Amino acid sequence: MNSPTTHERLSRFLKSGIYRFENSTAIFIDPVRVLNRFYTRFRVSPTAYYSRFFDDDDHNGNSKEETPEAPPDSRKRKRKKEKKPRPLNETELIAQRRHQEVRPLLLKAHETLLGATELLAALKGLRSDGHFTDEECRGSALKREANELNFVELGRVWQSPLYEISLNFDQDQNFTQHGGDQISVPVFNNFVVNNGDNDVEAELLNRNYIIPRKSCFYMSDLKEIHNLVPVECESGFNLILIDPPWENSSAHQKLKYRTLPNRYFLSLPIEQLTHTSGALVALWVTNREKLRRFVENELFPSWGVKYAATFYWLKVKADGQLISQLDLFHHRPYECLVLGYSSQKDVDVVELSGHVPIPDNQVFISVPGDYSRKPPIGDLLLEYVPGSKDCHRLELFARELGAGWNCWGNEPLHFQDTKYILKRRRDR
């Protein structure tokens, strides 16, 4: 079978959001196109998604986070004394060794991207999706300036059990069992489900949200997570994706989201959530060596998860350049996805399931979205999931929803606000 041409690969990318390079295992992802496959009547606003690494006044793919050049006349400034680099401590040396091991792999993946000229040309237009007019994009930007709901705070007040979300089902969906086209259900500590084949528009406290087809969410704090555990193991999950709010001083400074002490995550009932045929567990981890050792030595063993592989997310700007220097110690332009297998019984889930062996050191590349927003890589993991093709998927600490996914967290509706999602033009 002939390998696809460059034009065919680009054509597939424009439809799916996934670009597979020739003679490379690296993959480029456009999260907006991937997410849009979850919706029937709506689309993710590319202007809203790519809010950081595109300049609002420059559509040529230049980053607004690039550091401006210093003025030529700087004689009045006092020259700062260069600090001598201090020697690395033992933990930092281990982290540096990890980095040096993966560095050639990341460099090769980045060189592959820079050699894909047709893809690079397409990247410049990621933020100006032709499905929306300039006026619609400006309207979306104005919405983003409005205050959004703080679900974490709402869930803590005494009125939280009284808050209801109204689901407005499309007329061609058969939901007569609910007594009409609109139903209202508790939004906290409750399974909110859209079993239909179309997106559902929802309203909560005068804010509008879009619920993708075939999706479900449960919004609560950590102490209520046991409510996710199924009564029967056959109703468990084959794919569990986790993006914990790790302890992070930077996140506290930016006030983007609340974090939790790392040891809190030891209590996650991963084994009880696992399907009888086993589960692939995918855990997002930062590059802090202390955290990596915690995951390897304590967290995975406490969950009963057997380590399988590590994937790497390489972050680039719209021009294809890395968002920071590869060797910048505290701000590396990549993050890790640590993968392992969980089973209900003391069996080797890898041998039992007969699924495709999971490769190590897979690299996927994308332009980052909002702070700490991860690219939607769930579909890329499906071939490594144990069990039947009817995969039950769960995301923990989710901040957005996806078709076919069950999502839990204290703000799973965050990116479902209509300031991030616009109606398809054909529906206007």
Predicted regions and their residues:
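Class I S-adenosyl-L-methionine
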Residues: 1-242, 246-266, 272-274, 288-428
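Conserved beta-strand signature within the Rossmann-like core of class I S-adenosyl-L-methionine
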Residues: 277-286
